[in-house]
Amino acid sequence: GIPCGESCVWIPCISAALGCSCKNKVCYRN
């Protein structure tokens, strides 16, 4: 539930390496 400061509209979350996932076109962690 914490925004990672990254969007994932066109590309995947680069911050996925930090445990972030795409939700509602924004990368979140927990």
Curated annotation (Swiss-Prot):
Record-linked Pfam families: Cyclotide
Assigned keywords, A-Z: Antibiotic, Antimicrobial, Disulfide bond, Knottin, Plant defense
One of the protein's GO biological processes: defense response to bacterium
Cross-link (Cyclopeptide (Gly-Asn)): G1-N30
Highest taxon of source: Eukaryota
Disulfide cysteine pairs (residue numbers): C4-C20, C8-C22, C13-C27
Keyword DNA-binding (UniProt): no
PTM note: This is a cyclic peptide.
Entry-linked InterPro entries: Cyclotide (IPR005535), Cyclotide_bracelet_CS (IPR012323), Cyclotide_sf (IPR036146)
Function field: Probably participates in a plant defense mechanism. Has antibiotic activity. Inhibits the cytopathic effects and replication of the human immunodeficiency virus. Active against the Gram-positive S.aureus with a minimum inhibition concentration of approximately 0.2 microM. Relatively ineffective against Gram-negative bacteria such as E.coli and P.aeruginosa.
Entry remark concerning the domains of this protein: The presence of a 'disulfide through disulfide knot' structurally defines this protein as a knottin.
Family note: Belongs to the cyclotide family. Bracelet subfamily.
The protein's name in its UniProt record: Circulin-A
Organism, as annotated: Chassalia parviflora
